[in-house]
């Protein structure tokens, strides 16, 4: 386009303004993050009424096997971020320290551990879990954090151990993780008390690739 042509530049300006207006309207129609989170946590907190299971899972853990069985995944790390954003973290961290946890520990872990004992935080605590799923591909803290919560709620804990792969992965690592996925599915079956729906898992897996 010749930028010295006033007519052409005006046409481009009108077009870009129109596109920006359409995009603005699209965002206004979309539900806000607050709305989405409200629906999500309402669904999770009503799980006992609707007969569904709740799993607390690390943010890097494989969530598709849970969703395929109708289990509602809940993320304590996200909850820790919400507590911090709501400026409620200091008090909960101090409570965790009074319980014997070092102030050197991750503030997300401290605030979540303390929150579980008082149903505090911005949403009155997370819904009680039926199981915990911990994958160590995110950090080392989650291992002891989730062990602590599993003991507190007296629920089963599954730990998925993933090898560090800095430059691709070896076949041995793939087989090792795959064998754990088989154990993970058996774990979910045991907690849910029903056979696994592999057809639904295939559907959920395909959606994750979109």
Predicted segment positions?
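An N-terminal assembly and electron-transfer interface module characteristic of large anaerobic redox
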Residues: 1-210
């Amino acid at each position: 386009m010749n930028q010295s042509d006033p007519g052409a530049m005006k046409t481009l300006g009108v077009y870009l303004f129109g596109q920006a207006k359409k995009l603005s309207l699209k965002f206004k129609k979309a539900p806000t993050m607050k709305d989405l989170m409200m629906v999500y946590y309402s669904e999770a907190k009503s799980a006992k009424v609707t007969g569904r299971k709740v799993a607390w899972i690390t943010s890097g853990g494989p969530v598709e096997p849970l969703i395929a069985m109708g289990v509602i995944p809940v993320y304590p790390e996200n909850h820790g971020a919400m507590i911090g954003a709501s400026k409620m973290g200091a008090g909960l961290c101090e409570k965790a320290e009074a319980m014997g946890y070092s102030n050197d520990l991750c503030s997300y872990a401290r605030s979540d551990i303390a929150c579980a004992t008082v149903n505090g935080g911005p949403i009155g605590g997370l819904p009680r879990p039926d199981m915990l799923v911990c994958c160590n591909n995110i950090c080392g803290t989650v291992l002891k954090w989730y062990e602590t919560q599993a003991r507190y709620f007296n629920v089963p804990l599954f730990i998925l151990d993933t090898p560090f792969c800095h430059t691709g992965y070896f076949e041995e690592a793939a087989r090792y993780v795959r064998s754990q996925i088989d154990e993970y599915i058996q774990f979910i079956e045991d907690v849910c008390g029903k056979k696994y729906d592999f057809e639904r898992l295939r559907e959920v897996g395909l959606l994750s690739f979109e």
